[in-house]
Design a protein with these regions (language model features):
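Short phosphate-binding/catalytic loops that engage adenosine nucleotides
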Residues: 40, 501, 884
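Short beta->alpha connector loops at strand-helix junctions that form conserved
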Residues: 46, 484-486, 505-508, 596, ...
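Short mixed-charge
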Residues: 77-89, 519-522, 729, 761-770
Length: 909
């Protein structure tokens, strides 16, 4: 191990580190150093660097202790010098805290130990020095309990068991006939310490360590060890924090909030973390230590008078009771409060962000223990950024970068009422496929969702094992969708996001019985008509009806979007199949439609009947008769899209799915189709069997359909061109792009383009008029990417269909990946779900290669993506660096993509 500096001291307005050293000192250590340097009262201490955490896992506990010992002993002497106390001394013992601190905030995920250095001699010395034996023994029992849990592993043996120390405390309170910990006497606390030690001896076979240095090394190594505990690992996964970052450890002289009625501890925020309101707020406890505030053992009180009054009103507590039982810190300690208010304002002005601060008041003296940029909701994030911009605290670029694109989701969808959700019964959990909140009666079939809405005006929750395009109308009419199978990019998930519809997919615990129309899950039975609620942001499914409220899009949101548009280079379009989708996307700032899936148009009303006539036709003439019925319908649909986009580009993808998706596969559905079509059932059965494929995703679909049945391409091309000309004739500008799907060979595209061009020329001749249009292709077959130079000879634009391109490049089925994806993620084989976050090293390199080769042949070639990755922030950033012109995503992801595009441009500068 290299001879480098591993320990950095701070105290008395001096520090060896500073706020810019987050990677080395962690967020806590860096900010403690910085607070010292700007004159904030901070107890002295030292920080062991994050690099030591990596060394701990590489070389082990003993090697790290041996390596650290000289620097730590020297740093401890610095604390002793500044405090006038000595670590391990019997007369003036120095007590310290040991805390974690990664470079990214991970509140509550790792371990903390307070009052370290306590033993049988130190407790008597503290009691004598302070004249407060109860405080001394209370601090001792807290230390034994914390150390026992964190370092010695004295935790419940099973989820049914209680904390062994809490059991002992409850027994002591019961024995004494008291309710609160604060009611225990000094003698009671002495007895608790004896009983705690006995419990440690019984469970571990060892005496509780009395040597302060042994205690310290045990605590330091335990904090390093907590970097890899289950909750820390999960938190890192959820927040994309790399495991290799490690945590720092900060050792700090103790200050005590539990010395009596003139002492306290608390947590505060410089602004409201839930709403973003510019209101100093927080909670505190008299005669307590920091862990008490977050543990919920006692009811904390509000810091400010205004906050206290708001809290009391919400709790239906009278002003008299509030003032006498729950007074604010502002009322109880006005001088200390004034200093705290000045410090929080100073810190916010200094760090230029909303601050989360921890403090302790020891015998009337205020000490700051931590400050960090506070966690906040999506709504608060936007409001705080825009407010600080207006206040002149930050500039436009900082305001944009301060807002996380993914958190905008919280602003765009309905949300559950916070009070209602706390009392809701969770029955299972799936994947949070599409954000939002939905509640309604259960139905199992798409047509029943339609009937429920038509007959009662109530939207239902559509519950399916999995969905298909045939369920589209039911999905549209449902309040939300719940599926037992499918991942984040399954049909249900993709379509739901496009609709802005709440969806929970892949809830594998569900036992769905279509015959009895019931769900069995975790001991609950839910019948058709019973109410359930879905949380599309967490994947949780609740029994019964949970109250929801509409998302509130304030003026701050619009201002943020304007700023995003100002700085972004990458354009953002929407995947939209209907004028309603297009209008929604346009409202969110989409600059065109990057993908219109024409097949979705065929499932509404009588359209499916005409399309099935085409499928059943025995020859081309029969197919053309059926297609003639579809022509005016398609033309009308396209007119609506062109009008909604008002001159922005509209990319229409020609028919893509295999024909088997348009026919029923169950006996009941086939009989119904035979009756509606007035043909023998056997003909339906035979046609369905003839359309079946072993691997339809790689089968007779996309351009292969258009090349074998060119009349389909002719009809769609005519509908598109005629619609564009009709809309332009009404005074609305149009920008038409026709996209051929699933091209793997430039000859396939050349054949399709020939059909499109000849059809367009025919329409131009009939109308004695012309209109500009472009023909391009969807790059979703790997061969298309590597032969992009040949394809660019024909294509006027590329749109990367990253859903299928990911499937074909990785060899993963997006509908079946759920069977092994969790294992691959756990083992580190995959870092992310490749259908959610673009595989930049594999699929991404194909995209780069295709763009390079395509523009080598056609320099002004327009390139974009239209897969679900188009709304994922890191994938959008990749698209910016890869030189794409636009991304296209679901309407409700448009704001996220716009903000991500602005981030990419600003980071590049």
């Amino acid at each position: 191990m290299a001879d480098v500096k591993r320990v950095y001291t701070f105290g008395n307005k001096e520090a060896e580190g500073n706020g810019k050293m987050r990677e080395l000192l962690g967020g806590k250590g860096a900010n403690l150093a910085e607070m010292n340097l700007i004159g904030i009262p901070v107890p002295p201490g030292f920080t062991i660097t994050t690099e030591v955490c990596s060394e701990y896992y590489a070389h082990g506990k003993d090697a790290v202790i041996q390596m650290l010992r000289p620097e730590v002993e020297k740093a401890m002497k610095n604390i002793e010098k500044l405090t006038g106390m000595k670590f391990g001394d019997k007369e003036m013992p120095l007590l310290v805290s040991v805390r974690s601190g990664a470079r990214a905030s991970m509140p509550g995920m790792m371990d903390t130990i307070l009052n370290l250095g306590m033993n049988d001699q130190a407790v008597e010395a503290v009691a004598k020095r302070t004249g407060n034996p109860r405080f001394a023994w209370d601090s001792y029992r807290r230390f034994v309990q914390m150390y026992g849990v964190v370092v010695l592993g004295m935790k419940p043996e099973s989820k049914e068991d209680h904390d062994p120390f809490e059991v002992i405390i409850e027994e002591q309170k019961h024995k004494r006939g008291v309710k609160n910990d604060t009611d225990l006497t000094t003698d009671d606390l002495k007895e608790l310490v004896r009983n705690f030690k006995a419990a440690v001896k019984k469970q571990t076979g060892e005496d509780f360590p009395a040597c302060p240095w042994d205690q310290l090394w045990g605590a330091v190594c335990a904090v390093f060890g907590s970097w890899m505990n289950d909750r820390a690992i999960l938190y890192r996964k959820l927040n994309n924090i790399p495991a290799e970052w490690g945590t720092a450890v900060t050792v700090q002289a103790m200050v005590f909030g539990n010395m009596g009625s003139n002492s306290a501890t608390g947590v505060a925020f410089s602004r409201d973390a839930a709403t973003g309101e510019n209101l100093f707020n927080g909670e505190y406890l008299i005669n307590a230590q920091g862990e008490d505030v977050v543990a919920g053992i006692r009811t904390p009180q509000q810091i400010t008078l205004e906050g206290s009054k708001r809290w009391a009103a919400a709790q239906n507590i009278s002003e008299e009771d509030r003032r006498t039982k729950y007074p604010s810190l502002e009322e109880v300690m006005p001088v200390v409060y004034k200093e705290l208010d000045e410090i929080q304002h100073h810190l916010e002005q200094y760090f230029k962000d909303m601050q989360d601060i921890e403090f302790t008041i020891q015998d009337g003296k205020l000490w700051m223990l931590q400050c960090r940029n506070g966690k906040r909701t999506g709504a608060a994030m936007v409001k705080i950024a825009m407010d600080m911009l207006r206040e002149g605290l930050i500039d436009e670029r900082t305001a944009v970068l301060r807002c996380e694109p993914a958190k905008l989701d919280e602003l765009l969808h309905p949300v559950f009422d916070k009070k209602a959700i706390t009392n809701a019964q969770v029955i299972t959990k799936g994947l949070p496929a599409s954000p939002g909140a939905a509640t309604g009666p259960v139905v199992f079939f798409a047509e029943d969702a339609e009937k429920t809405l038509a007959q009662t005006g109530q939207k239902a929750i559509l519950v399916r094992i999995e969905t298909s395009p045939e369920d589209l109308k039911g999905m549209l009419d449902a309040a939300g969708i719940l599926t037992a199978r499918g991942g984040m990019t399954s049909h249900a998930a993709v379509v739901a996001r496009g609709m802005g519809k709440c969806c929970v997919s892949g809830a594998g615990e569900l036992e769905i019985d279509y015959k009895t129309r019931t769900i069995k899950v975790n001991g609950f039975t839910v019948k058709e008509g019973d109410w359930i609620s879905l949380n599309g942001s967490t994947g949780e499914v609740y029994l019964g009806q949970v109250a929801t409220m509409a998302a509130d899009l304030s003026g701050d949101f619009g201002q943020l979007m304007d700023l995003a548009g100002k700085y972004a280079v990458l354009k953002v379009r929407a995947n939209a199949d209907t004028p309603k989708d297009a209008a929604q996307a346009f409202g969110f700032g989409a600059e065109g439609i990057g993908l219109c899936r024409t097949e979705h148009m065929f499932f509404e009303g009588d359209r499916i009947k005409a399309f099935r006539e085409m499928i059943l036709a025995d020859d081309e003439a029969g197919r053309r008769v059926a297609l003639a019925k579809l022509l005016p319908i398609q033309r009308s649909d396209f007119e609506g899209l062109f009008k909604a986009m008002n001159g922005f580009p509209v990319t229409v993808r020609l028919l893509d799915p295999p024909l088997h998706e348009f026919v029923p596969h169950d006996e009941k559905g086939q009989k119904e189709m035979a009756r509606e079509m007035n043909v023998p059932l056997q003909k339906i059965v035979a046609k369905v069997e003839s359309l079946a494929e072993f691997n339809p995703m790689l089968g007779h679909r996309g351009c292969r359909l258009g090349n074998t049945y060119p009349e389909i391409t002719e009809m769609q091309a005519r509908a598109i061109i005629e619609a564009a000309m009709n809309v332009r004739a009404q005074g609305t500008p149009v920008h038409v792009e026709i996209m051929v799907p699933l091209v793997g060979n430039h000859k396939e595209l050349r054949y399709q383009k020939g059909i499109i061009d000849s059809t367009a020329e025919q329409v131009f001749s009939e109308r004695n008029d012309k209109i500009d249009y472009m023909v391009g292709t969807m790059i979703e077959v790997p061969r298309a990417a590597v032969t992009a130079n040949q394809i660019a000879e024909v294509a006027e634009f590329f749109s990367f269909g990253t859903n299928d391109l990911t499937q074909m490049t990785l060899g993963f089925s997006r509908d079946d990946i759920g069977k092994f994806l969790p294992i691959y993620l756990d083992k580190g084989i995959l870092k992310n779900d490749p259908f959610q976050i673009l595989d930049q090293n594999g699929v991404g390199q194909l995209i780069r290669e295709a763009v390079f080769k395509g523009r080598g042949k056609r320099p002004m070639l327009k390139c974009g993506i239209c897969g679900e990755h188009g709304g994922e922030p890191t994938s959008v950033e990749f698209c910016h660096y890869a030189g794409l012109n636009y991304v296209s995503c679901s309407p409700f992801r448009v704001p996220i993509a716009r903000l991500a595009a602005a981030h990419a441009a600003l980071k590049e500068k």
